[in-house]
Design a protein with these regions (language model features):
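N-terminal export leaders
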Residues: 1-4
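A short Gly-Trp-Pro
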Residues: 19-20, 25-146
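Boundary at the C-terminal end of the N-terminal hydrophobic targeting segment
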Residues: 10-17
C-alpha cells in the first residue's frame, strides 16, 4: 500500500533540499550535553522509559536535538510499548538510512539528514498505514508544541 503524507500535516513546510551541517567532533561536544552527544554522535542508546517524550501527547513537531531539523509530526507518533518514542512515518527528506551490523543480525538505522545525528532504528512491527516503527531515542529529539 502506498501512503502519502503530503498535505496531511498542516504547519509543516516541505523541504526542497537540505544543507548538510559539517562540524568537528570537538564542536559537537561543546554544542551537545553528554547524553545527547553519546546518542547523536556515538550511536548510543538511552535507557528505555527514560525520555519524557514517551508521554508527550500535545500536537507539535519533533526536531533533531542536534540541528533543529523537523523529523516527525505528533500525528505520526504512537505508543509502541517499547519505552522509546515511536513513529510510523517521518517528514519528507528528513531522514537518511544505513544498515547497522553491531548486533548478530543487520538492522536499518536512521539518522538526521542534515547533521547525520543517530536517532534510532526502523522495525517492521508498526501500525498502519506503513507497518513501520521508527524507534527513536528521546534524548535525540526536541519537541516543539503547536
Amino acid at each position: 500500500m502506498l501512503f502519502s503524507i503530503g498535505g496531511l500535516f498542516s504547519g509543516v513546510k516541505p523541504l526542497m533540499s537540505i544543507e548538510k551541517i559539517d562540524m568537528s567532533d570537538t564542536e559537537w561536544q561543546s554544542k551537545l550535553n553528554e547524553q545527547e552527544y553519546y546518542v547523536l554522535r556515538k550511536h548510543g542508546t538511552e535507557r528505555p522509559g527514560s525520555s519524557i517524550l514517551n508521554d508527550e501527547k500535545r500536537e507539535g513537531i519533533y526536531q533533531c536535538a542536534g540541528c533543529d531539523l523537523p523529523l516527525f509530526s505528533s500525528e505520526m507518533k504512537f505508543d509502541s510499548g517499547t519505552g522509546w518514542p515511536s513513529f510510523f512515518d517521518y517528514l519528507p527528506k528528513a531522514l537518511a538510512f544505513k544498515t547497522d551490523f553491531k548486533l548478530v543480525f543487520p538492522r536499518k538505522e536512521y539518522h538526521c539528514a542534515r547533521c547525520e545525528g543517530h536517532h534510532g532504528h526502523v522495525f517492521k512491527d508498526g501500525p498502519e498505514p506503513t507497518g513501520l516503527r521508527y524507534c527513536n531515542n528521546g534524548i535525540a529529539l526536541k519537541f516543539i508544541p503547536n
